[in-house]
Amino acid sequence: MKKIFYVLLVLFVIIVFVKPDIYPVSACENQHPTSLFSDKEASIICIDSKNIYDFNDNDPENIAIPGHLYFPPNIDSPVSLIIISHGAGGIFRFHYDYKDMMLEHGYAVLIIDHFTPRDTIIDFTFKYVTEPMMVSDVINSAKILRTHPRLNGKIGYIGWSKGGIGPILLKNKHLYDKLVYKNDFEFLAGVYTYCGFDIDKENVTDIPMLLISGNKDKITPASYCSELISKLNDENIEYHILADAYHGFDNYAFFFGSYLPWQPVLNANTDKCLLKINPIFQTVNLNDNMDLSSLKNRTRFLDECTSQGAYVQYNSQPSIDAKKILMKFINKHMPN
């Protein structure tokens, strides 16, 4: 009975707090990469992406992913672009608060909908909409928009929670060079994202990175990011741990706080459960006896490396602090 209540509660939150699309996502069905319904300040683009289950997937299906593109008003010269990648709950209204803030500072913003064209509403696991799929969406967006006449070719990449795993993975130079080629990102950023990955400190990109964690976050613990950053010893990584901040501290859908009993909590404190990208671009554990290349394998990994249940809560002060930190970082590394 409790589980039914929590499911109904989540559906209510999604209906109330998820921002309606400016255009229907069905507009991208059977479309080539292009801009549709374009006007002066907003349009939708159809991203020619791939459903890659893991980075070594050699025969992925093509998929058209919608992205909502916004331009700052009253600026006629080309501007820089910030790509936003949502988390496990999809696109929420708070993402649009960040978008509005970035527009006010003169940046264009693309918010990608990773879920709807994949028939997904929420995905609290690594199983259905995988991190390689989301990275593919972002990279292919950058390729399409790099030559847009209203953009200057400079692009930054920010992800929240599940969507922030991509920026972490792209600090791996071996993977970055395979996926991104010469289309450099000006910066990478992750807000309360999962840092349970091992990266060789000799194989790190020099792209500036910002990470922001909450000190009370049990879903994506700050300790995992601290350990990764300590190992990499990379002066290009800026890290902030915010006080009194749970997972989702900037999402007012969690205004009253909520315990999510079904929420998987990944344990990255052993070689069995710490992940890496191997030389053939598989996502594997450090023991090399589990990979994430199939639904079956990912289910096994989750069964063996997760517990369930975590608390989420909005907190206005960390939310304000995160916005200030993020905007200062963007202005420093991608000034208009």
Where are the model-predicted features located?
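A conserved short beta-strand
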Residues: D177-Y194
